[in-house]
Amino acid sequence: MSEQERIQECLRKEIRSLLISTKDGLTPQQLEKEYLLMVGNHLPLRILGYRSTMELVLDMPDVVSVCPCGDGTVILKAIPDESTKGIANLVAKQKSNHKVRNSMQKGRASVCSGPSSRRRVPYRGRVPPILPAVVKSELKDLLALSPVLLSDFENAFANRFGRSFQYVQYGFLSMFEVLNAASDVISVEQTRAGSLLTLKKSVSEEKQRGWPAAKGKIFTQPFRMKQQGSYPIGFPVAKACFSQPTSNMEPPKQILGMERNSRSNVMETSRLNHSEKLNQLALTLQSWVVSHYGFNGSFSSAKKHKAMYTLRKFTENLMVCCLFNEYMLIFKEQLSPKKLGFLNVIELVGALSDILHVEFREGEQDLLVFDADMKPLASVQPDKKTEAKACVSSPPRNSLSTAVIKETTWDCPSKNHKEPEQKIFKKPNLVVKPLQLQVEINKSQLSLAVANHDIPPDAVRDKKLCRLPPLDTSTLVGVFVEYILSPSQFYIRIYSRDSSELLEDMMIEMRRCYSNQLVSDRYAMPECFIQPGHLCCVRISEDKWWYRVIIHRILGKQEVEVFYPDFGNIGTVQKSSLRFLKCCYTKLPAQAIPCSLAWVRPVEEHWTSRAVLQFQKLCGLKPLVGVVDEYVDGILNIFLCDTSSNEDVYFHHVLRTEGHAIVCRENVPSKGFRDLNPLALYTKSSVTPEDIVLKELGYHSQQHYFNEDREISPQSKESDLYTLDEIPTGMPYLESVTIGDDIWDENWLPLQAKMGKESDAASHLFTSSLGGKKPYPSCKEIPQKDWCFSTPKDIWDDSWQPSGLVNGMKVEVQIPEGLGAQEKHIDTTRIQKQSNVKSASDSPALPKLEEFYISLIQSQQSAEGSQFEPSNIQTPPKQIQLSSTPTLVNSGSVEGSPESLENEDFSSSSAITVFKDTSQGAVDQLSLILSPEHQISQKFYIPRSTATAALGAAARLATSNSLLHWYPSVKKMET
């Protein structure tokens, strides 16, 4: 028996013992208190997986009997078993304690009362109370603004009306009863945040309202025609037409006709069974109440007569506001829509549509009211270019503004005239969605509807989303793999505060905005705007969240295929669920990034289903660590690593181990994205193409993206230099360097020390300053712009401190210490001349020193060492030090004369030349060339002032293998 089963079995015995000892039973709250007093701990609800005490006892039908009471409380009584029947009989024979009973009743009253009431609720009958019309109107007014969570209802009601919602004074014992009483206007939806109170759509749009005529002409709402089948036989429903004036009928005759029809209806239903009789009677009573008192049952016929009397005192048209003022002056009674249960004046006037005729005219700021009997309406002439106004009959209460409505007549024909086929002409530019009617619209009206459709001003029409800016090479990012087609075609989403959290905040705001029925109807997309490439939003019915989508293609009359730019997948949705996207929701770039797994390719031509399934299992629904490699045709090639376990799992290594992939040292372009890349098709780049610079690092497959303020000159000719060794076949160390850009292996991103095979190639790389001679005349052929580099901002060597910048370009050359005295004074005019020459050249800037990669190079040039002339290069064989004194190089030649060099301290005679090569198109490329003595040696000396953190993981590993040595400290000699 498991621990949970043992706890549950023990709990069953304890609850049975507690309830058996109580003759009258306990409430759930009393059971919790008694259990705490007896055991000393609370009920183990969470351990057993229950959320409440009632859920626990309902799961014990053989232990607890739930007995509901008439006042709404629940009493829990024990069900004895074979071993406790004797005890239960003894307890049942005990006399009841009146003190305990009174205390229990007080406890029940305190539990049932709301938080705002401390007094005892009087006993009531079994019939639940009716929610007053005023309270219902307040609830509709509150929820008309936006849906409210049940937990926030008290605060929202207090902020709206300045008082707390005291449901106890209306006769309710709990908020649950209030919601049941208001179920015709309020719906409760379960969300992740809790119960969400929303206004029912049927009430908000007034689609289900309709009243039979009570006085004067026979009048019916247009949407009433859809509900003819729901009313009993014998109740005539008039149809609307556009011809013939109305024939007046007296109210007494109509009432008698209704009574006769109801009697005949009762005679017909007497043969039915009892349940059908009750349903028929309920429908009859409902129709009679609606016809006499209106939909809410609060507008009586007496008030209708008073309103009619007030209206008939004026022969001319009367505004709605004047009607209410005159009503108050005549009858000394205020006609308040709130007190009568209506949300606003428009809704109240709509309830009087059988006696009032309402028009809206251009230039008027209010509705005009006429007597429906005294003002016959002319029929609409289709050949005349006159716009008529529709009769406002219970308009939607959620209308954002008073819309321009066409005038129509809903008059009935004479007795001897047959009803012609009804046609309804309505203007299409209503603010809210019009009522769904059985109408016939010709082609001209349809084109007019498309032209005059009212589009919200902040709706997105032709705007495109931006893509995320490219990531730098070697960047470590946290990612979620959102959509997978294959290891060479999948989408990721970056997990960070600037991306994923902003996306979540935007989706929460979209849900809060579009969940309001007013906004949802306002931003509904018409058919003419549903075109491929249009940016909009849609709600997924499964999770009720709103997503940004881009229409990919139209599948039919009802469905479209959309692309989700934040997640990368493609799905099918209904056209009716599409909504215009607000412009404020386009600021966040598309979060999906098309990716391909770096350095892998399938064993065969295409990825197998097992390989795709294995890749999906590796990704899962968890955050991963991604290491950026490069961009190929706009597709990010990235390494993925799972760090959730004790050992890091590299996906490319797993696919290679299981035989699904072949690891290669270059990235193959993705065929899937080459065929279809919706993100590149429907979005735009966040930066201009000239701001993105592609950098080649050693071999053609390595590319790098720099900042926007860097530029590159196009390739002009092939370089005469070549790379050193072949790329190693081993996998790179996915570990980042602690400064600068993240590097994992010096061999994977080697520093390109490009040396020529011939002696003249090496002569380009060295300079000498012995006696002002020019032993290397071939240096004249080197362009000046190839000798310039930008001063780095972050210096990781203390000895490297360049000063005296001229145009931001420096070249470092070291000369023997003996020449230091000749370099004390420098001609400033020559420096100015050199700066002018350098400014004229268009030399791009090299990368920062934090992008300087340390590479362990085993020299294979020992045979070429004889080509150099050691006599011309005065260098100590065991000392290499980076000079802190930069010098200027003449554009014509590289001289070592005192006029061309600026010297402060020279402690080494070795020449270390840092240059830039642009002939091959290699941008900001650094080369570190050693003397022949050091090229033969396999030891690489660096100054001790260099921080160890500047070396990569592989460099630190090489230090332990004696491949890299610190240069011994040598004091500077005084001259």
Curated annotation (Swiss-Prot):
Region Disordered: start-end pairs: 820-843, 864-905
A GO biological-process term: spermatid development
Comp. bias regions, Polar residues: 831-842, 864-894
Protein name: Tudor domain-containing protein 5
Residues bearing PTM Phosphoserine: 891
CDD domains linked to this entry: LOTUS_1_TDRD5, LOTUS_2_TDRD5, Tudor_TDRD5
Positions of the Tudor domain: 529-588
Keywords: Cytoplasm, Developmental protein, Differentiation, Phosphoprotein, Repeat, Spermatogenesis
Protein's UniProt keywords contain Phosphoprotein: yes
Function: Required during spermiogenesis to participate in the repression transposable elements and prevent their mobilization, which is essential for the germline integrity. Probably acts via the piRNA metabolic process, which mediates the repression of transposable elements during meiosis by forming complexes composed of piRNAs and Piwi proteins and govern the methylation and subsequent repression of transposons. Required for chromatoid body (CB) assembly.
Gene Ontology CC terms, in alphabetical order: chromatoid body; pi-body
Family per record: Belongs to the TDRD5 family.
Gene: TDRD5
Record's subcellular location: Cytoplasm
InterPro entries (UniProt xref): LOTUS-like, OST-HTH/LOTUS_dom, SNase_OB-fold_sf, TDRD5_LOTUS_2, Tudor, Tudor_domain_containing
Domain HTH OST-type: 7-80, 127-202, 299-373
Organism, scientific name: Bos taurus (Bovine)
Cytoplasm found in the keyword field: yes
SMART domains from the UniProt entry: TUDOR
